[in-house]
Each structure stands twice: as C-alpha cells, then as structure tokens.
Amino acid sequence: MALQNIGASNRDDAFYRYKMPRMITKIEGRGNGIKTNVVNMVDIAKALARPASYTTKYFGCELGAQSKFDEKTGISLVNGAHDTAKLAGLLEVFIKKYVQCYGCGNPETEILISKTQMISLKCAACGFVSDVDMRDKLTTFILKNPPEQKKGGKDKKAMRRAEKERLKEGEAADEEQKKLKKDAKKKGSKDSTAKGLKKKATTATGSDEDHSSSPTRSHDGDKAAADDDDDDVQWQTDTSIEAAKQRMQEQLSAATAEMVMLSTEETEKKMKQPTHKDGSTNGSAKEIPNDKPAVTKPSPYEELIGDIKASLGSAPTPSQLKAVLASSTLPPQDVMNAPLEALFGGVGKGFTKEVVKNKKYLAVAVPDEGAQTLLVQAIEAFGGKCNPEALKEVPVVLKALYDGDILDEETIVDWYNDAVAAGKDSQVVKNAKPFVEWLQSAESDEEGDDE
C-alpha cells in the first residue's frame, strides 16, 4: 500500500512520521446511477483519526452530490464520476480544516464539542485549542453525529489505581531486597568479629600455656624448640574458671567488662537468703491471698483492634495489616470498623492529616467497590463516637479519600442518598452534605460537557 505524508505542506518531507494511504477510487455504474467508490476510505480515516463518514460527507458537501458511507461494509460512495486527483485535493482541504492543529500543524488533534455547540480541535502535541469555522456545511453533520468519546471516569480511575498498586508492589519488593542486603552485611560483619575474637582467644591460650609451663620443660630447651617447629602440635584450651576469667579480662575492655554479668555470685546470694514458710524472703512480703480478681476477657472485636495496633507497632507495612484483616472471622463491617479505631482512636484536630498519612493502610482494606461502601459506613460509625473536632473534618476526610482513589463518587453519593432516605440525621451525614452536593454538581457538569 502506497503511503503519503498527511498535509499538503509536508509532501516533500522524507522524514515526516505522520502518514496515510494514497487514495484509490473506482467508478461504478452507468448513466444517472454512476457513482465514485473510494475503495480505501476506512484506512484513510483511521490514519487521520476521524470517522470515515466525516470525509465521505465532506466530499458530498463540496461537490454538491449525495454521498453515503455504510458502517457495516465500509463502502464509501459519492454520486457522479469524480477524478481521483479532485477528491484527493478535497481531502487535503478537509485535513487542513478538521485534522491539523492551527498552531503547530501536527495532525494529533481531537474533536471537542462544547455546551454551546461549538467545535474545536485540541492538539495533543502542543496543547493548542483551534476553533473550527462553524459556517462550514460539515459542522452541522458533526454536531448531529459527534465522535465517540474515549473511555473516562471509572476506567481512568481503575487504570490509575492499578498503576499505583503496581508501583506499591515494586516499592515493597525493593524494600525487601534492601532489607535482605542489610541482613547479609550484618551477618558478614558478625562472622568477621567472631573470627577475630576466636583468633585472639587462640593467641591468649598460647600465652597462658607458655606462662604455666613446668620447670622440667625449661630444662629441656632443645626438645621444646623441636616441638615448636613440629606442625602436628595440637594446642588445648584451659577450661578452668580462673583461665576463663583471665581470658575475659584480656579480651574485653574495661567498659565492656563491667557490662558482663556472671550469674554465679547472684545465684549464691539467692541461695543464702532465708525463705520463710509463707514463701516471703527476709519477712518483707506478706501472704498473698489465693483469691485473685477475675480478669474480663476482651471481646473478639477488641482483640482485632489490639492485633491491628500490634501489627502497626514497629516498621509497619500495608501487607501486615492486610494479613491481620484477612485472618479475622468477624463480620465484614466490624473488620472495616476496627482499622479506623486502631489508627484514629482519640484523634481530634488534625484528623484529615492523620487519614492522609495512613491512607495506604485504608487502601489495603478496600480491595473492591463493596468494601468502599463498608468504609463509608465505618466512617459514619466512627463519627458517632469520635472527638467533636474530628467530626467537623468528615467532609475533608471524604474528599481526601476520593482524591486518593480509595472512594468513588458513586459510592459516596449512594451512601448519602440511602442515609437521607432512611431518615438518618446524624452529624456525620449533615457534615458530609456540602461535599456530596459538590460531587453531584461536578458530575452534572461532566455530563453536560459530554452532551
């Protein structure tokens, strides 16, 4: 298939990357039924990123003839016998008016239709918005048959969420790899220090044995020298308490030696202390009554809150919280309520900052749309028992979770409508009203733009 550059002004540019197929036409029929068939109109329209019906209709408007494009078969027909060069010239005019950016000339544009029924071209290369001349005949056809809009809203949000999850998993893998490297380095340093201590102990043992050698050995000097030169000599370590203490004093510094605690003296002191019949030492303690106060066992819900706080104790990760929540056998709503109480219990002013700070843990608890409803209901339940200062920040918290792709606008609006329909007059619902109204107005504006 022969290709040519898009736009007459770029015809001689050998390195121009925007190309389209060269037009192929075919004359069909005779007499009054003669028609011109643009054989590859579908391929040309794909290259221009415009519907094939637009180009076909433009030929009909400019030639004053009837034109028709069949969506099922992809056949483009214009009444009358028309030369290929003439149709190609009209196509260049169409490209200049409805495809190329008026600012940079690139064909990477998208047709936009405003509320006031004005057509404009938005350039993806430079961002320039070009206003189309509304006096042209084709504009009426475009307004009646607007181009298909790209998938937005939920699909975009789902893509962003999937991308964030992918980045989080990558960061978690990197952190785990760094931790393994650190552990390996620590282990290597410990092994090296242990080898150094062992070497010092060996040299100290040798010096001890040199000092404690017998007089007979000093008389046999030649024999001892011969023994030192022998490679098969095996040194033995003196395991007596005195030798061990001496080695400790030689190897450890004064500061370290004070930290070493020998348990032998303490055990001897304890053995010497007299024990009375009542089990007390030195008569200082009195008899402990056998009747111990009954300890109330915490409920499963309180145990879950305790487990969550324990998992968030030192170097917490979202995966740890996810494992704790997955292991719980409580109802789903209780499982969702527990993280809020564990994370934000007792928080007053600054509730929103805490939510933004810990939103990664909330994101783990909300894997799907059903869990979003549970989270909104958990916020409502938490608002009934939280600090009044935190209660005022409920709408800001909802917006923070909405901006963080943890809650969708549909979930928030549906929850609010259900609460109002059920006659709930809680302060959480009242405080959330301005934010819900803002969501609804923004949604209606988007629908107006689409129309």
From Swiss-Prot:
Q: Where is this region: Disordered?
A: 143-233, 263-299
A GO term, aspect molecular function: eukaryotic initiation factor eIF2 binding
Q: Which domain of life is it from?
A: Eukaryota
- Listed GO CC annotations: cytosol
Instruction: Provide the residue positions that the database annotates as binding GTP.
Output: G29, R30, G31, N32, G33, I34, K35, T36
* SMART domains in the cross-refs: eIF2B_5 (SM00653), eIF5C (SM00515)
* PROSITE patterns on file: W2
Basic and acidic residues composition-biased segments: 147-178, 208-226, 266-279
Pfam families this protein is in?
A: eIF-5_eIF-2B, W2
State its role.
Catalyzes the hydrolysis of GTP bound to the 40S ribosomal initiation complex (40S.mRNA.Met-tRNA[F].eIF-2.GTP) with the subsequent joining of a 60S ribosomal subunit resulting in the release of eIF-2 and the guanine nucleotide. The subsequent joining of a 60S ribosomal subunit results in the formation of a functional 80S initiation complex (80S.mRNA.Met-tRNA[F]).
Spell out the protein name for this chain. Eukaryotic translation initiation factor 5
Q: Whose protein is this, by species?
A: Zea mays (Maize)
